[in-house]
Regions:
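Dinucleotide-binding Rossmann-like beta1-alpha1 core, especially the glycine-rich loop
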Residues: 66
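Active-site core segments that coordinate phosphate-bearing ligands/cofactors
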Residues: 2-62, 70-97, 106-351
Length: 351
């Protein structure tokens, strides 16, 4: 990724100015340089969503969502930039007219081939020809499923809070926000631009943080007995100790966490960033573990606030944050994030 960024190629404008090692062209370049025989022998390189539709139908079409957001396809111009691939060291892909990474780029929901092929149908126990649609990246599917509530997509930020987190902000025009991926055309809401941020570790950062504490084993046993995950057990415990969710911050007074165990995805775009815990004492009990959990949630909230502020500085305003994902369902989590960001957080109902 650093080698690619050193080129300063104009395509990088559409990934926030710096490409992330989480994206696919740095990964393919690594493969070429470190496992050249695999690179040379590979017939196709797929994002997961596209692999699944190919595996199911034999159709080699790629989703405009996957290739725009992770592969540097320029959807607003309906093309790959051959000069970019040649400059970064992947000239073969351009010379082959991009046959290995996608020549037919289509919208999510487009029917694939003739539906399920015989092999896939047998493996899944479904009829041959069952319709299969072109897919999306998981977080973007979560975004499209939530961002249209209330006053519509351009007024909401979708926040998919799971193991990692993704922020999805929809605009009518292209907005270039340094350190925030995009703008991507028609990658989530058709006909609109998408700015994508997030945190490389979110729910996973909380899990990592809690694992360091001496009381973690005891807490896990109690959570297991209660039949809930440890973070849920801690959140429930917090609510028994305060009059309202917003007051939970008092439990973590003097304790501060920057939970960037996997770097900063946005808006700093720094994969080398590290986590920080400040304010630790000699405490080893469940109350201190609870305080550490609250401080970690606040740290996640401050990281989300950084993204909102960076986008606001470039003219993007979000009236609401529409949250989805398993880590964002507890009322304590939603309230602490709302307080940190100064923006209302809403959650859609599932049926």
């Amino acid at each position: 990724a650093e080698k690619i960024n050193a080129t300063g190629h104009p395509v990088l404008r559409y990934v926030g100015g710096k490409i992330s090692p989480e994206m696919q062209t740095p990964k393919i370049l690594w493969l070429k340089e470190n496992r050249p025989h695999i690179y040379q022998q590979a017939r196709h390189f797929f994002d997961l969503a596209d692999y699944l539709t190919w595996r199911s139908t034999g159709d080699e079409a790629r989703s405009v969502c996957t290739v725009t957001c992770k592969w540097t396809y320029l959807a607003h111009e309906q093309r790959w930039d051959a000069g970019y691939f040649r400059q970064i060291g992947l000239a073969e892909l351009a010379d082959e007219d991009f046959v290995r990474i996608g020549q037919r780029i289509v919208d999510p929901g487009t029917p694939c081939g003739d539906g399920l092929c015989a092999t896939a149908a047998e493996e899944m126990g479904l009829p041959i020809g069952t319709p299969v649609a072109v897919g999306m990246i998981d977080a973007h599917a979560g975004g499209i499923g939530t961002v249209g509530v209330l006053n519509g997509a351009v007024n909401n930020m979708a926040y998919v809070f799971g193991t990692s987190s993704c922020t999805m902000t929809t605009t009518q025009e292209a907005v270039f926000v340094p350190g925030v991926w995009g703008p991507y055309y028609s990658a989530m809401v058709p006909g609109y631009w998408l700015s994508e941020g997030g945190q490389s570790a979110a729910g996973a950062a909380i899990d990592q943080l809690l694992s360091f504490h001496p009381a973690a084993a005891e807490a896990r046993e109690q959570a297991k007995a209660a039949g809930v995950p440890l973070p849920v057990w801690l959140a429930d415990r917090v609510l028994t100790q305060v009059a309202s969710p917003s007051e939970a911050v008092t439990l973590a007074a003097g304790l501060h966490v920057v939970p960037e165990f996997l770097g900063n995805r946005a808006p700093l775009a720094d994969p080398h960033a590290k986590a920080l815990i400040a304010g630790l004492g000699m405490e080893r009990d469940l109350d201190n573990l609870t305080a550490l959990y609250v401080a970690g949630l606040c740290g996640i909230g401050y990281g989300l606030r950084q993204i909102i502020d960076a986008q606001r500085a470039c003219g993007i305003e979000s009236e609401n944050i529409v949250i989805s994902g398993g880590a964002g369902q507890h009322p304590l989590v939603r309230q602490l994030l709302a307080d940190a960001c100064g923006v209302s957080i809403v959650s859609t109902a599932s049926r």
